[in-house]
Design a protein with these regions (language model features):
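Polyanion-binding interface signature
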Residues: 2-134
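Hydrophobic, glycine-enriched assembly/anchoring segments
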Residues: 121-153
């Protein structure tokens, strides 16, 4: 079990990444797209939760990892993917956890829990009012679920 921080290194909700990834008008995202950052410290402190990325090549694409199934504390199931890459000790690890195939599924879900209107920016105030600035991740013991995510208060 490990807490993934939703704030940046300055203690703020990023305006155009993380929970607000879709707020960046200069990239390929939609307004409510979001991801949960996985930092070097997260990987170094929990070797059982975050494994190096797998690379499998097919004729048309290279896939880093297969989709995973997560269950949130409220029972919501979501298909997600470990994405991006960061090198740690000579191996590549994911740098974020996103919903798939639609990146906005995670953003819309979190906004509903935070009572933030769709299309709007998530702020520190929203997280403070909710009572959490992190999401707890754990491996699941249920064979149909890969991970458990907890955002309960």
């Amino acid at each position: 079990m490990h807490n993934l921080n939703l704030l940046d290194s300055n203690g703020n909700v990023p305006h155009t990444s993380g929970l607000n990834w879709g707020q960046n008008s200069t990239n390929h995202t939609r307004k409510d797209d979001a991801y949960i950052a996985i930092r070097v410290n997260d990987i170094n402190s929990t070797s059982d939760l975050f494994l190096p990325l797998l690379v499998s090549t097919s004729e048309s694409s290279t896939r880093r990892n297969e989709p995973i199934t997560v269950r949130w504390d409220d029972g919501t199931q979501m298909t997600m993917l470990f994405e991006g890459n960061q090198e740690i000790n000579g191996e590549e690890y994911a740098k974020q956890l996103s919903s798939c195939p639609n990146k906005n599924t995670l953003g819309e879900y979190l906004k509903s829990r935070l009572d933030v209107p769709l299309g709007k920016l998530i702020t520190n105030e929203h997280l403070d009012d909710y009572g959490r600035t992190n999401v707890t991740i754990a491996l699941s013991h249920d064979t149909s679920i890969d991970y458990i995510l907890d955002f309960s208060i």
